[in-house]
């Protein structure tokens, strides 16, 4: 839906269409010149004159316009990849907001029960003021976080609705570790992946345009042609003698050399820009792949040990509190730590998935 309703993609599509129309314009010739002139001083005669560039100029202009259309197409691919990345990121953040909201809701319900129990025990003289106040304070903190998380969930849905252009209530899938066609055994740059990216293709196409521009400027060195019709004498002048033919002579050759040199300089600029773009793309790729590897290893630890230890910590603290070996302060502190571990896991899943989204964007998926 986001791809269908995107104004950016529509604009990119219209730019491609505009460039295709410019391909037709590349072979247009100048308007003819109509002449009304008295060549003999006795009568007025009508003439017409038409100028043409050397045929190679039109061919090169056509080729340059075609390459510009390809560049616009490459730009639209980048726009599409960027839009996909934005929507995926917004969707991922929404998934995280919902997962965290559920965690806060569970913690809020539990801490509410403990806060009320602490109030009753304080009134019964079973605990002191510090324990009761600490239980109330922790519940207030958690409840505030829970209310805030509800706002985040609503904001996430509005963001997705904005991207998709729908007003219907929608709900995302569960937040889970993503999968991608990437190898995380090392962080060596994948040259095949880099070489096939829309971003690099855009830079390479810019070089091709500069090369075609040089060819066009060189073709302008060739002479232009002029043909026309005008009666230069009396009314009985034979028709063949009324025709005129002209040929422009590229006498001021240094002017063409300047234009060619400028086009060659632009090609060098395009090549440097392409090299800089590749360098930046490689750096972004390495950074995203390093992040993915880092979060991948962290998730393996949490799924193998961290989450299980958090659950064991919660169960042990429940037993200790029920047996009277933990007071409210120690019990609530332990529960808070256990819930925090679970939220850290959710954030790791988000960070790992975000690294995959970045890698997908860089290769145009």
Segments predicted by a language model, with ranges:
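Periplasmic alpha-helical coiled-coil/stalk elements that build and connect Gram-negative outer-membrane
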Residues: 82-198, 288-291, 295
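Amphipathic alpha-helical coiled-coil segments
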Residues: 12-26, 79, 83-104, 112-115, ...
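Short helix-capping/hinge motifs at transmembrane helix termini and TM-loop junctions
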Residues: 125, 165-166, 223, 324, ...
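Glycine-centered coil turns and helix-coil junctions that link the paired helices
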Residues: 54-55, 121-124, 253, 320
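A small-residue-enriched
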Residues: 1-54, 192-261, 265-271, 283, ...
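Short flexible linkers and secondary-structure junctions
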Residues: 1-93, 100, 105, 129, ...
């Amino acid at each position: 839906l986001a791809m269908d309703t995107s104004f950016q993609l529509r604009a990119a599509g219209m730019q491609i269409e505009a460039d295709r129309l410019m391909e037709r314009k590349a072979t247009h010739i100048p308007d003819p010149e109509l002449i009304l002139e008295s060549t003999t001083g006795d009568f007025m005669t009508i003439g017409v004159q038409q100028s043409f560039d050397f045929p190679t100029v039109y061919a090169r202009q056509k080729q340059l316009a075609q390459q510009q259309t390809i560049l616009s197409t490459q730009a639209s691919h980048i726009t599409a990849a960027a839009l996909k990345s934005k929507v995926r990121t917004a969707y991922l953040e929404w998934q995280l907001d919902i997962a965290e909201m559920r965690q806060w809701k569970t913690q809020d319900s539990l801490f509410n029960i403990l806060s009320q129990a602490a109030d009753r025990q304080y009134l019964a003289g079973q605990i002191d003021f510090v324990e009761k106040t600490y239980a109330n304070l922790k519940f207030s903190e958690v409840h505030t976080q829970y209310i805030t998380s509800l706002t985040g969930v609503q904001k996430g849905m509005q963001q997705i609705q904005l991207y998709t252009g729908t007003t219907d209530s929608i709900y995302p899938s569960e937040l889970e570790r993503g999968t991608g066609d990437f190898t995380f055994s090392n962080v060596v740059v994948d040259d095949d992946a880099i070489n096939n990216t829309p971003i690099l293709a855009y830079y390479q196409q810019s070089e091709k345009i500069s090369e075609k521009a040089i060819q066009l400027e060189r073709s302008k060195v060739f002479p232009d042609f002029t043909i026309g019709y005008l009666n230069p004498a009396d009314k009985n002048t034979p028709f063949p003698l009324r025709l005129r033919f002209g040929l422009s002579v590229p006498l001021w050759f240094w002017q063409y050399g300047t234009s060619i040199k400028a086009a060659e300089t632009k090609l060098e600029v395009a090549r440097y820009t392409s090299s800089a773009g590749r360098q930046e793309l490689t750096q972004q790729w390495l950074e995203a792949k390093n992040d993915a590897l880092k979060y991948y290893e962290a998730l393996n630890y949490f799924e193998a040990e961290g989450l299980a230890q958090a659950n064991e910590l919660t169960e042990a603290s429940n037993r200790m509190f029920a047996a009277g070996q933990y007071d409210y302060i120690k019990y609530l502190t332990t529960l808070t730590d256990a819930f925090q571990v679970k939220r850290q896991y959710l954030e790791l899943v988000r960070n790992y998935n975000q690294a995959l989204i970045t890698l997908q964007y860089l290769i145009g998926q």
